[in-house]
Amino acid sequence: MRCRTGVLAFSVAIGLALSLGTVRAAPFMIVGNDEKVLWDDQGKPVMSLPGKDSVLILDLADPLNPRMVANLSLENSVVGPPVNLDIAPDGSIALVADSVTIVKEGDALKQVLSDKIWVIDLKANPPKLAGTVIGAKQPSGLSFSPSGDIALVANRADKSISVLSIKGTDVKVIDTVAMGDEISQVVFTPDGKRALATKFAAHKVALLEVNGDKVTYTKTDVTVGLWPYNVIVSPDGKIALTADNGGAGSSDGNVDTVSIIDLQLKPPRVIDKVVVGDGPEGLAISPKGNVAVAVILAGSNNKAAFFHRDKGYVTVLHVDGNKVTKIKEFDVGGLPEAAVFTPDGRYLMVGNYLDQDFSIFKVDGTDVTDTGKRFKVPGHPASARMSLH
């Protein structure tokens, strides 16, 4: 494939030149590439059998020139929010949820729900698959606790949350919390005492209490916007933001919102909404807490739709306490999914599924600028998360 100016091509060589010491000293990013689903000119899914998916570990010591540390042949899925993987707070392991696979029935291909969660040993040189956890149906968004002792996995089809115990690379399901509705993502508050889960089809966010490895659904829900797909919590734990997708996981031509939940109120509730565009999916907040972004699909995978745009875009938000305002927008690539900030908050990466690359933005305070640089990945980036350090 011909690379455009400013695009940094990766070598997908089997031999990996980086040492483990270099990897562990630098921020690194995990990326899930799904090679099973694309779309035709009428916007209909074109499916392929599994076997070409990959999970990448990338060294971001130089954010403008990311380097590949590992390319693991592991199945993962674009079906769901782009947060179906995460890196432990200490950087020792990563988890990847395999949400949906594809099988052949007669002459047709069909999507089938999976239940697997991959455990990747990031201390190994190079990083490698350390184990497989069998969870519930359609594991999707997931997050580690701030201490790294447990992780929570949103099981969409099972309408539950799996609680995983983490002891090195020994990861086990120790509990399953029934939620009563389809759950797409779950995140912890910074103090580790609460968690928030998006009830996608119910248009709500559920509140959970966390006490050690005991996770309890409080039966308290916050009504947000339509089809909340993704949720994040500010670094100070005072507010949460939801990506209200509006179109049940895709664009529909209508503008959608980010809801702001004040977590200091009792009970927590929505205090404002910001219009961000058609089909927000990726969602991220800077480690400094003053800038957030919503990644907008904008019908970029549906050429036949009246609302089609060739490119998706990123809506940049200024966060000042519990006040969130829209600053600007930037075009990115086709069907943008994940957004991640580097640990120092100075750079933002946005994955473009159809373009098979990431856009790189510079962040200076609340000023976000497009560097004009992109880096290619060997596949279609469906999800991404960043290490904490």
PLM ranges: what are they?
Residues 4, 21, 25-389:
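Predominantly soluble domains enriched in secretory-pathway, periplasmic, or organellar proteins
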Residues 1-10:
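Bacterial N-terminal signal peptides that target proteins for export
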Residues 9-19:
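Bacterial N-terminal signal peptides
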